Amino acid sequence: MAVRATVSRFPIDSDAQEASGLPWGLTVTPFAAKDENGIGPACGSNGHLLPRCENCYAYFNTYCELDQWAWNCSLCGTLNGLPSDAIARYSNPHSIPEMTSSFIDLEMPLDGSEEEMTQARPVYVAAIDISSSEEFLELTKSALLAALEALSPGALFGLVTFSHKIGLYDVQGPIPVVKNVFIPPDGESSLSLELEDVMPLLQFLAPVETCKDRIAAALETLRPITSWERSAGAGQGMDSVLMGGRGFGTAMEALFNYLGSEFGNTFALARVFAFLSGPPDYGRGQLDTSRYGEQYASKRVDADRALLPEQTPFYKDLATIAVQSGVCVDLFAVTNEYTDLASLKFLSIESGGSLFLYSSTDDSTLPQDMFRMLNRPYAFNCVLRLRTSTEFKPGNSFGHFFPDPQYENLQHIICCDSYATYAYDFEFADNTGFSRHSGEQPVVQIAFQYTVVVPPEGLSNSEMSSSSRGKHTLQRRLRIRTMQFGTAHNINEIYDSVDHEVVLSLLVHKVILASLEDGVREGRALLHDWLVILTAQYNDAFNLVQYKNGNKSMSSQIDITFSQCPQLEPLPRLVFALLRNPLLRFHEEGVHPDYRIYLQCLFSVLDPSSLHCGIYPALMSYSTPDTLAYPRHSLSRAALITSGSPIFFLDAYTTLIVFYSSTADPSIPFPPPQDCLLRQTINKVKQERSITPKLVFIRGGRDDATVFENYLIEEQDVDGNGFASAMGFVSFLDDISQRVTEYMK
């Protein structure tokens, strides 16, 4: 569980917090195996015996004062009696995790019988859009073949297709059999019969270890639905060709109800991989894609505002059904046409899944993403709870979870991998703030309760017999991290303790929220105003602006680069980069609304360092493929020219670019050889990433370098009005300086 705060020394009261101009909060990556310093938890069992405070329900931890019979809660100060079993346990503190570490992970007893525990097999279902092209199906097949290699023995796999009909595959016999049920074309009607009546669920879900070859054979039989079949299926004459026929909404609704019948019996979590080649345009949940088009210019509608909200609550409601059925949906959209991910995204993010967007089948990383996603551990049925000491409390929470309807500051996460990150901001409980004199310090406690599927121990794949293949066990665990923070006695101490990457994380969450509610322009304005106010507060705090005749002097005195405070120095550059990011660029600059939604979903789950890389890419230079020249350059053409290095490596999180300058010595091998330092760096980056970044090699002077040059944002105008020499970031700072002057008058 990695936790990072915007400031490691908290403001003493609300006045100090407001005067700093900084967001106050933290990010947490609950299922990360280690903390932010690379240290793992102290592990143990009997999590249900961990003492809890009678007043605030916080868990006992190393910061609590303990005597023989009682303990003081480190969060609220309440004196709690110790039960007799705890007194006996704590007499030998060295063997007890909660006595030795403030970061613990304890096993919990499971509800239900031992039999139910061992029958919970991992279930995976691939739902494939066959109202698509051959290329789309070939890509999907290769992705699923990769997925089959990553699935653990004992897993069950189902294959379903959708178009104007739903196709269920039985792959447990000698040849694959498909049974179809037609989807009513209108947006109101449900299927004429339940999928369970078409094919019993346990006939549909096949054991992977015995049916892998037959699943692969079934995938090879997939063909795109023809326009003739669509028109015939829709009951139309042969001469009328019905375009469309992608009954995604009806298919998903039927599939969740189908799987839900065995939730808690055959499986504890079913993961559905939905492959979509375009917008749903048939049956329930069909989407009107005409809202994306030229008419926005003539209707004077703000496209940046109009295309961000969902046009129907259907998929949000469907996500609720998925959760109730124990289903988590990962949505893979492979399309360059407008698909309205603004409406579809809820199906994945609210059911605990991920949203992937690939604009073409040619260079798609879909197979690698599938394999990577299934190969990493995940927790499910998770509950996340943040508690604080009494002087302050959590304000807003951000991330892909849904709040508990009954309890405050309790979030449910359906499925959580080791990368998923959530954020909170804080506010003071009253005007008192923290005590300036007592030794008590602010405390934050994060509790994360989760379930994992543990495969049978000591059995290799080849040893798996049919009798043992189902013996996966569920394990319920409780992970707790308790942290104590210092308080800042003045604004310098706040500024000296800033973590700019976490500040960026909270800013990104807030501007995404603002742009969803009020449009991209409002999100940009919020960010701009924030930087102006922060710069003004900083100049005021350090007394950098002199007063003459009662008025503040010229803006030339204003320090807009935070030269007195190294921790704040990166922020203007990060804000500029965020304003240049497709997340906040204008529709008329050619930012596809689906790509914007994809970035919102991706950036909402990234840890602070990854997000920093996505907003302001890392650019380093090499003098040879084996020699690093400089570890960090600014994103400007000037930096390239002045460095004199022949090779540059740019890491933009989703894209990696190796650029050879036009003046590079022809004897330097291109592309870089596999055993060189640069390749090792690339491979390490790819290995540690949650998604598969696209790798591009470019030779300056020979290849089209546009994709690389687009990342050199510092000469670009912040509002996207083209390029100008010596403008961009410099003129942005001038503008901020003028606004700060006006603000401080």
From Swiss-Prot:
One of its GO terms (molecular function) is zinc ion binding. Its main location: membrane. GO terms for biological process: anther wall tapetum development; endoplasmic reticulum to Golgi vesicle-mediated transport; intracellular protein transport; pollen exine formation. Disruption phenotype: Despite normal fertility, impaired pollen coat exine pattern formation with reduced sporopollenin levels. Plants lacking both SEC23A and SEC23D are semi-sterile and exhibit developmental defects in pollen (especially at the late uninucleate stage) and tapetal cells, including defective exine and intine, as well as signs of cell degeneration and structural abnormalities in organelles of the male gametophytes. InterPro entries: Sec23/24_helical_dom (IPR006900), Sec23/24_helical_dom_sf (IPR036175), Sec23/24_trunk_dom (IPR006896), SEC23_SEC24_subfamily (IPR050550), vWFA_dom_sf (IPR036465), Znf_Sec23_Sec24 (IPR006895), Znf_Sec23_Sec24_sf (IPR036174). Keywords: Cytoplasmic vesicle, Endoplasmic reticulum, Membrane, Metal-binding, Protein transport, Transport, Zinc. Component of the coat protein complex II (COPII), composed of at least five proteins: the Sec23/24 complex, the Sec13/31 complex and Sar1. This is Protein transport protein SEC23 D. It comes from Arabidopsis thaliana (Mouse-ear cress). The gene is SEC23D.
